[in-house]
């Protein structure tokens, strides 16, 4: 029925494209009409369109004329030189109808899927121009600094011709320049640059003049699937050095390495013994029928199953798994031990290991044997695995009648510190084990200049400046014997998902979005529109070639490269990691094939390498970093030879990454071909393939070195990729659900902070905080007054110590009502505040000689006090929230929903945060002691003093001393 309706009415995509096609015709009509205008008359269209918008016309109504103006400018610029990245290039682009179609979709808030080489960069200029007419912030988000700079210089020339200003944000841009850049009509930059500026404006800036942004109206995200999906699990974090250096990584690194060594040696021994049994059969296609021999083979495979749980990448294990029947027997034991009735036997077998590694879920578990080895042979402590029951410990202290109240307090503090140290040690131990067992050099990270540099798993690019969280980075530093740096403390954080929700309008463009259309719709309310190509795609997509082993796969890849190289075709070989790219490079060198390698270790030459990758006879080995934002342009000889030949050395866990690699060839009607070479030892196949795989392998098993190719295998790959994509989507959605809780708190704190930064009269803000504190105290006093053991005297003692006021017990009892008591306490505190700061203001005025400047100084002091306490308490709150997030997962054991638990407890934490901020501010205001002392200068220096205060620049003539409560105590 649905198919019939689609044939009759067309799909939703077709209906949208048909509707937009009418607008394309209007745009072309406007372009033709504007051809008769002079350059000055065409430029004048920009202020005219701006005025019409201000007069009430909608952008939708202005769209045909605005897009027509842009198209006409592109036509006029044809043949003119534009300087891009230091080179002069001739402008040669005029928007096609399909590009105008994509531009309309982006203005309407769609994600446009346009194939490689279809001109996404030029397409974006039209909606950027239209939305910039509003005068509101318009941003183009790219995946790296190079593309941001290039796009601003290249297509930004159209916007500048029309009188708009453009700016580009790159890493290292100083704050004073950033402020000017954000004032431009259109700003180009990466997601991290925009995101970090947002965090800095709301967590680092201490004056409104230090804030650089001007809001969020419209953004187009280039390669939107990379930004909002691939990087969605990695939050933007502003952090600084932690207050304390955790020595546990240095102390335990050698012991952990020793434990992992014991595990490796034990697994190697088991594997070697198993191979002695299996060696005679590794070169045969059929296993013997003898029952005793088969029992021995089965037991050897059982032993290798155990090895797979201890060292999944063991060489003997990988070699044996090349044999389809033996592979099936190992997997059969895996199925056997997963059955509920065999769980006890499974645990017994696993207990013979020191550590059980779960490669599928990227986790591990220390066994009892491993703990015993740690304690008895390696020199660890039993306390490393036993956490303290703080409730029990505190109860024992309270029951000890020999201790005074002060001794009990000191004992509790000591126990708490001991618990903290023990937890830190246990956490460090676990992270060191994770670094050794699950993090691989040249796959997850590289070592460069005595530092660990993260490799982005999706792009293959290095991420200098980024660090793994929760001590994992320090653990890897310890593992690789580089300098172990301090753990960082988070000052501010936001996920890209929630950052881009700040924009009123959001659109995107990419060559690969349709496979993730569900996620874009459910999380971002963005719909994907596939835009037709300008010219038919001539790419030849060969069937995947499957090989039994990795060794056979690489032999076939090299043979294919040699064959294609002889024909003169440029070849791009895509690899999944630095390790694989270097391995393939070694093989090519052995075969004397000249080639270039592009990976995280030499990414600085990316533009140069890509520029030469389309020349006849070029061979380029690249990680996924060559998959985005780079068009490989062919020379004439390369086109004649058949175009770019893309070879994939494995399938990525995401179908999009594979499509991106294919998309490097056959751009804009060029010839090209793509082929993937796979083995059943590839990570995707090993971890996520269907259980039916062994049956297929045994049925289709070819002779040594021959490939298998069948639609059934293609479906197998797609199923595995969908399984991984589904898992990753669940993780991203789960992350967002938790971050949504944090996001509401973040917005509340940032709004409060911004109100303080922009407030004209900080005395009013300070008094508001005093009133809130008074209300909290009133609740506390009246709640305590109705309790069985009233401790009102203790509250009054604390109050008189913190604030210069004394409460009247009889007055409080007479009032009785919370609001009345709050007003009573508030009046006392505000009166004391007025007395204190009126005297201070009078003193400043007398010294400076200007009441206005004295008022400005007091405002700045109050602002500084309030902002500092917001920031300090927020940092502590972020740590508390991280701890809560890590703890609530265990609540599921007690049949509780961790997310609901997190929401409930985070609300209580946030209430406590607001209370703590207000109390800290008010206590500091009353503890503050300020004095201005004249410098040893003649009286004629006083006017300069006033100017210095007014400008708040480089304070010299007078000294300002701030004494807080910590210093007093």
From Swiss-Prot:
<keyword id="KW-1278">Translocase</keyword>
<keyword id="KW-0067">ATP-binding</keyword>
<dbReference type="GO" id="GO:0005524">
    <property type="term" value="F:ATP binding"/>
</dbReference>
<dbReference type="InterPro" id="IPR014001">
    <property type="entry name" value="Helicase_ATP-bd"/>
</dbReference>
<dbReference type="GO" id="GO:0031522">
    <property type="term" value="C:cell envelope Sec protein transport complex"/>
</dbReference>
<keyword id="KW-0547">Nucleotide-binding</keyword>
<dbReference type="InterPro" id="IPR044722">
    <property type="entry name" value="SecA_SF2_C"/>
</dbReference>
<dbReference type="InterPro" id="IPR014018">
    <property type="entry name" value="SecA_motor_DEAD"/>
</dbReference>
<dbReference type="InterPro" id="IPR011130">
    <property type="entry name" value="SecA_preprotein_X-link_dom"/>
</dbReference>
<dbReference type="InterPro" id="IPR011115">
    <property type="entry name" value="SecA_DEAD"/>
</dbReference>
<comment type="similarity">
    <text>Belongs to the SecA family.</text>
</comment>
<keyword id="KW-1003">Cell membrane</keyword>
<dbReference type="Pfam" id="PF07516">
    <property type="entry name" value="SecA_SW"/>
</dbReference>
<dbReference type="GO" id="GO:0005829">
    <property type="term" value="C:cytosol"/>
</dbReference>
<dbReference type="InterPro" id="IPR011116">
    <property type="entry name" value="SecA_Wing/Scaffold"/>
</dbReference>
<dbReference type="GO" id="GO:0017038">
    <property type="term" value="P:protein import"/>
</dbReference>
<comment type="subunit">
    <text>Monomer and homodimer. Part of the essential Sec protein translocation apparatus which comprises SecA, SecYEG and auxiliary proteins SecDF. Other proteins may also be involved.</text>
</comment>
<feature type="binding site">
    <location>
        <begin position="117"/>
        <end position="121"/>
    </location>
    <ligand>
        <name>ATP</name>
    </ligand>
</feature>
<dbReference type="GO" id="GO:0008564">
    <property type="term" value="F:protein-exporting ATPase activity"/>
</dbReference>
<keyword id="KW-0472">Membrane</keyword>
<keyword id="KW-0653">Protein transport</keyword>
<feature type="binding site">
    <location>
        <position position="631"/>
    </location>
    <ligand>
        <name>ATP</name>
    </ligand>
</feature>
<dbReference type="Pfam" id="PF01043">
    <property type="entry name" value="SecA_PP_bind"/>
</dbReference>
<keyword id="KW-0813">Transport</keyword>
<dbReference type="InterPro" id="IPR001650">
    <property type="entry name" value="Helicase_C-like"/>
</dbReference>
<protein>
    <recommendedName>
        <fullName>Protein translocase subunit SecA</fullName>
        <ecNumber>7.4.2.8</ecNumber>
    </recommendedName>
</protein>
<dbReference type="GO" id="GO:0005886">
    <property type="term" value="C:plasma membrane"/>
</dbReference>
<dbReference type="GO" id="GO:0065002">
    <property type="term" value="P:intracellular protein transmembrane transport"/>
</dbReference>
<feature type="binding site">
    <location>
        <position position="99"/>
    </location>
    <ligand>
        <name>ATP</name>
    </ligand>
</feature>
<dbReference type="Pfam" id="PF07517">
    <property type="entry name" value="SecA_DEAD"/>
</dbReference>
<dbReference type="InterPro" id="IPR036670">
    <property type="entry name" value="SecA_X-link_sf"/>
</dbReference>
<dbReference type="GO" id="GO:0043952">
    <property type="term" value="P:protein transport by the Sec complex"/>
</dbReference>
<dbReference type="InterPro" id="IPR036266">
    <property type="entry name" value="SecA_Wing/Scaffold_sf"/>
</dbReference>
<keyword id="KW-0811">Translocation</keyword>
<dbReference type="InterPro" id="IPR027417">
    <property type="entry name" value="P-loop_NTPase"/>
</dbReference>
<comment type="function">
    <text>Part of the Sec protein translocase complex. Interacts with the SecYEG preprotein conducting channel. Has a central role in coupling the hydrolysis of ATP to the transfer of proteins into and across the cell membrane, serving as an ATP-driven molecular motor driving the stepwise translocation of polypeptide chains across the membrane.</text>
</comment>
<dbReference type="InterPro" id="IPR000185">
    <property type="entry name" value="SecA"/>
</dbReference>
<dbReference type="GO" id="GO:0006605">
    <property type="term" value="P:protein targeting"/>
</dbReference>
<keyword id="KW-0997">Cell inner membrane</keyword>
<dbReference type="InterPro" id="IPR020937">
    <property type="entry name" value="SecA_CS"/>
</dbReference>
<dbReference type="Pfam" id="PF21090">
    <property type="entry name" value="P-loop_SecA"/>
</dbReference>
<keyword id="KW-0963">Cytoplasm</keyword>
């Amino acid at each position: 029925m649905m198919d019939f309706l689609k044939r009759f009415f067309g799909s939703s995509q077709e209906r949208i494209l048909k509707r937009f096609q009418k607008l394309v015709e209007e745009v072309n009509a406007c372009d033709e009409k504007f051809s008769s205008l002079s350059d000055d008359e065409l430029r004048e269209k920009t202020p005219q369109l701006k005025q019409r918008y201000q007069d009430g016309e909608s952008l939708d109504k202005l769209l045909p004329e605005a897009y027509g103006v842009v198209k006409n400018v592109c036509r006029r610029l044809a043949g003119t030189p534009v300087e891009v990245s230091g080179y002069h290039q001739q402008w040669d682009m005029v928007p096609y109808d399909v590009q105008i179609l994509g531009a309309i979709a982006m203005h309407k808030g769609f994600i446009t899927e346009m194939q490689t080489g279809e001109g996404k960069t030029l397409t974006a200029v039209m909606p950027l121009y239209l939305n910039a007419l509003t005068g509101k912030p318009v941003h183009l988000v790219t995946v790296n600094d190079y593309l941001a700079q290039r796009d601003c210089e290249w297509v930004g020339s159209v916007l500048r011709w029309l009188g708009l200003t453009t700016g580009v944000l790159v890493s290292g841009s100083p704050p004073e320049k950033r402020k000017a850049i954000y004032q431009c009509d259109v700003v180009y930059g990466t997601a991290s640059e925009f995101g970090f500026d947002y965090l800095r404006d709301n967590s680092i800036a201490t004056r409104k003049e230090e804030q650089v942004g001007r809001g969020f109206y419209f953004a187009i995200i280039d390669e939107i699937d990379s930004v909002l999906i691939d990087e969605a699990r990695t939050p933007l974090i502003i952090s600084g050095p932690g207050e304390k250096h955790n020595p546990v990584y240095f102390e335990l690194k050698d012991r952990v390495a020793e434990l992992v060594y014991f595990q490796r040696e034990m697994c190697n021994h088991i594997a070697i013994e198993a191979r002695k049994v299996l060696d005679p059969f590794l070169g045969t296609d059929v296993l013997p029928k003898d029952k005793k021999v088969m029992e021995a083979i089965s037991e050897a495979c059982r032993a290798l199953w155990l090895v797979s749980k201890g060292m999944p990448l063991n060489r003997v294990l990988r070699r044996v798994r090349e044999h389809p029947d033996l592979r099936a027997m190992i997997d059969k034991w895996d199925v056997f031990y997963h059955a509920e009735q065999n769980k006890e036997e499974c645990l017994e077998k696993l207990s013979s290991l020191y550590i059980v590694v779960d490669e599928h879920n990227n986790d591990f578990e220390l066994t009892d044997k491993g703990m015993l080895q740690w304690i008895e042979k390696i020199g660890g402590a039993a306390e490393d695995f036993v956490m303290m029951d703080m409730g029990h410990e505190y109860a024992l202290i309270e029951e000890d009648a020999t201790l005074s109240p002060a001794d009990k307090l000191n004992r509790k503090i000591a126990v708490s510190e001991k618990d903290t140290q023990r937890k830190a040690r246990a956490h460090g131990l676990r992270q060191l084990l994770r670094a050794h067992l699950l993090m691989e050099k040249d796959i997850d990270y590289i070592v460069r200049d005595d530092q660990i540099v993260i490799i982005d798993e999706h792009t293959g690019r290095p991420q200098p400046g980024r660090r793994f969280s929760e001590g994992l980075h320090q653990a890897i530093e310890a593992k690789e014997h580089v300098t172990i740096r301090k753990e960082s403390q988070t000052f501010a954080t936001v996920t890209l998902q929630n950052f881009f929700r700040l924009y009123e309008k959001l659109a995107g463009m990419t060559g690969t979005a349709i496979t993730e259309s569900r996620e874009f719709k459910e999380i971002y309310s963005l719909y994907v529109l596939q835009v037709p190509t300008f010219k038919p795609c001539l790419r030849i997509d060969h069937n995947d070639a499957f090989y039994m082993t990795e060794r056979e796969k690489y032999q076939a890849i090299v043979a294919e490269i040699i064959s294609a190289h002889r024909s003169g075709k440029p070849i791009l070989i895509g690899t999944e990691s630095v390790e694989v790219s270097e391995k393939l490079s070694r093989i090519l060198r052995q075969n004397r094939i000249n080639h270039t390698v592009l990976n995280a270790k030499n990414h600085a030459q990316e533009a140069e390498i890509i520029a030469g990758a389309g020349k006849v006879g070029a061979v380029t080995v690249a990680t996924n970093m060559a998959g985005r934002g780079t068009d490989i342009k062919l020379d004439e000889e390369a086109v004649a030879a058949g175009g770019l030949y893309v070879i994939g050395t494995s399938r990525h866990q995401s179908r999009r990454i594979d499509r991106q690699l294919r998309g490097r060839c056959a751009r804009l009607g060029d010839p090209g071909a793509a082929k993937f070479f796979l083995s059943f030892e590839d990570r995707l196949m090993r971890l996520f393939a269907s259980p039916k795989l062994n049956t297929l392998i045994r049925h289709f098993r070819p002779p040594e070195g021959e490939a298998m190719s069948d639609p059934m295998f293609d479906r197998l790959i797609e199923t595995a990729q969908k399984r991984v994509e589904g898992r990753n989507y669940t993780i991203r959605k789960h992350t967002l659900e938790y971050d949504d809780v944090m996001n509401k708190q973040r917005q509340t704190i940032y709004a409060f902070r911004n109100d303080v930064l922009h407030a004209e009269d900080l005395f009013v803000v300070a008094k508001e905080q005093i009133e809130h504190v008074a209300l909290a105290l009133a609740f506390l006093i009246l709640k305590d007054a109705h309790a069985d053991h009233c401790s009102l005297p203790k509250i009054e003692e604390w109050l008189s110590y913190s604030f210069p006021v004394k409460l009247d017990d009889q007055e409080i009892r007479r009032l009785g009502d919370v609001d009345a008591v709050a007003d009573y306490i508030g009046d006392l505190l505000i009166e004391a505040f007025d007395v204190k700061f009126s005297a201070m203001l009078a003193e400043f005025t007398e010294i400076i000689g200007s009441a206005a400047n004295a008022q400005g100084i007091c405002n700045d002091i109050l602002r500084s006090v309030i902002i500092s306490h917001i920031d300090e308490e927020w940092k502590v709150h972020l740590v508390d929230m991280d701890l809560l997030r890590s703890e609530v997962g265990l609540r599921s054991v007690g049949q509780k929903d961790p997310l609901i638990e997190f929401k409930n407890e985070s609300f209580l934490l946030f209430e406590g945060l607001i209370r703590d901020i207000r109390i800290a501010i008010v206590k500091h205001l009353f503890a503050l002691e300020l004095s201005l002392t004249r410098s040893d200068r003649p009286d004629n220096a006083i006017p300069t003093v006033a100017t210095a205060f007014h400008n708040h620049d480089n304070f010299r003539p007078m000294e300002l001393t701030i004494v807080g409560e910590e210093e007093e105590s």
